[in-house]
Design a protein with these regions (language model features):
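Subtilisin-like serine protease catalytic core
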Residues: 87-128, 134-185, 198-201
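Glycine-rich, acidic and aromatic/proline-enriched surface loops and short helix-turn segments
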Residues: 13, 155, 194
């Protein structure tokens, strides 16, 4: 925030007249997100420390038009054998001890393939992650995409014999899209910052199926 101090002072002064609200600083992109009255935008653009102004662009997840058909349980799923993930397991590279953040629609943290290796957020984050969209601890996945991706990454195969690529990895859930797959740039950046601030090793942002 040191590099943003002059702009922040300018914005905070305008909160008293209700021309500015909901100020949020980002460090990973040196950006400030806020709501402003349209009449104030031109004046804001004249500030010497502001390089650019843009909308908090809405982002949408791309889903398959047709549901993916369930396939019979196999010993090893095709995606794993295609990239030889099972070969490296034999050398001990199973993701053990590695924390992976899945930034998506949330996760079913009670899923049998995931619940035994969830990130320990302590009392501050009791549900093993955070809901950026609603700014609370409810990371429940009402869409299914986030849980699907989490399983692809680190499902441990408890419910059958299909597993994720890194079945011993630790899962952190960062909910950045709502149940319809809608989000915005501010929430995506906030999600990445949350993961980095909590010492994540890898972050996966809403991968395509």
């Amino acid at each position: 925030e040191a590099n943003q101090s002059e702009v922040l002072s300018f914005l905070n002064a305008e909160t008293r007249s209700n021309r500015v609200s909901d100020i949020k600083c980002h460090w990973i992109t040196n950006m400030i997100n806020c709501k402003v009255e349209s009449s104030f935008i031109y004046e804001l653009a004249q500030h010497p420390d502001i390089a650019a102004i843009s909308y908090n662009k809405k982002e949408y997840m791309l889903f398959n038009e047709q549901p993916i058909k369930a396939e019979p349980v196999r010993g090893k799923v095709e995606n794993i054998t295609k990239i030889n993930a099972d070969d490296v397991w034999s050398y001990g590279y199973t993701g053990k001890g590695v924390v992976v953040a899945v930034l998506d629609t949330g996760t079913n943290i009670d899923h049998v393939d995931l619940k035994d290796h969830l990130w320990d957020g302590g009392s501050e984050y009791p549900n093993h992650g955070y809901n950026i969209v609603e700014e609370n601890h409810d990371v429940t996945d009402f869409n299914g995409h986030g849980t699907h991706c989490a399983g692809t990454i680190c499902g441990d195969g408890t419910s059958g014999t299909q597993t994720g690529m890194a079945p011993d990895a630790i899962l952190m859930t960062v909910k950045i899209f709502d149940s319809e797959g809608n989000g915005n740039v501010n929430d995506i950046i906030s999600g990445v910052e949350f993961a980095v601030e909590n010492n994540i090793e890898f972050a996966v942002v809403a991968p395509d199926d």
